[in-house]
Amino acid sequence: RGFFYQCTGEDDLSKLLDKEKINGYIGFDCTAESLHVGSLLQIMCLRLLQRHGHRPIVLLGGGTTRIGDPSGKDKTRTILSEEEIEKNIKNIEKILKNFLDIKDPKTKPIFVNNYSWLKNLNYISFLINIGKHFTINKMLSFDSVKTRLEREQSLSYMEFNYMILQAYDFLELNKKENCVLQMGGSD
């Protein structure tokens, strides 16, 4: 009760969860060696999904960490080195394995790093095939963008595109891992 802030298609999701076992994911940026207490809610969502017989997918944002999530930030993040990001990914994966059941073959979590599909994206092709589905109007309505603009704080083009990369993550996970559920923060 009160665990979720909002849900798109809640009735359809309930029916789907009752009817079949699904794969659902949450993404974690790897900007630090460890997770913070704010990540506990997301971890508990993955555990809850798993305890009900579904398979959690943990997306470790090796690619998106290189850009930096603008949510809740008033300035552009410092770009981490590839070595720092890889170290953080290993540490965070180790932490998450303490919370999730890694032994049950039916619900064993899938760990993926979005750098594997983001590193070789062809920019022109990406804009033509993916970018056409996003409107600036909608992107300007997100809290992370509105807040920065209202405070007259800069928001780089790189950060502005972060949400498109998140959507692309879901597309890739749907194709590669049959993922049908995305969970995460409100923005």
Where are these regions (language model features)?
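NTP-dependent nucleotidyl-transfer catalytic core
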Residues: 1-186
